[in-house]
Amino acid sequence: MAVVIDANLTLALFLRLPYTEQAYRLMDHLRERRSTLSAPVLWEYECLSGFHRAVQLGAIRPQQAAEFMNDLLALEIERVDPSVENHLAALRWAERLGQSKAYDAQYVALAERLSAELWSADERLVNNLKSQGVDWAHWIGEVS
C-alpha cells in the first residue's frame, strides 16, 4: 500500500509533540503492512523549517537539529520530484479546499496521483478533505 506522509507527522518522530506516540505507532503499523512511504520534495524543506523553529523556540539545540536532519534524510521515504502535473493538481486542490497557500495541497495531489493514503498531523486539513468526500486522508489522531 502506498502512503504519503506530511511534514507535521514526520516532525513528531523527532520532536516531542502531542501526537508523537501516535506517530510512532503509525510508523510501526505502516512497516508491518510493508507500505511504501512517499512525500513531495517539499517535505524535506518543511521538516528543516520545523527543526529550525524548534531551535528558535529553545526546544532543541542547533546540533540536535543537524542530527535530526541527517536522520530524516536517511528515512526510507521516497521523495517525489516536482512535476507540472502535480503542481497543477495542487493548485486545483488548494482552490477546492479554500487554502490561501498550496503547500498542503502538494501532499494531497501526490497522494491522489499515487492512489495512496495520505497521513497527516493536520486535523483541519484532513477534516476539510473528508468533507469533500475524500476517504483516503487520515489524521494521526485516528491511531489508537
Predicted regions and their residues:
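Active-site neighborhoods of divalent-metal-dependent phosphate/nucleic-acid chemistry enzymes
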Residues: 77-121
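Acidic, PIN/NYN-like endoribonuclease modules and their adjacent C-terminal/linker elements
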Residues: 2, 96, 108-144
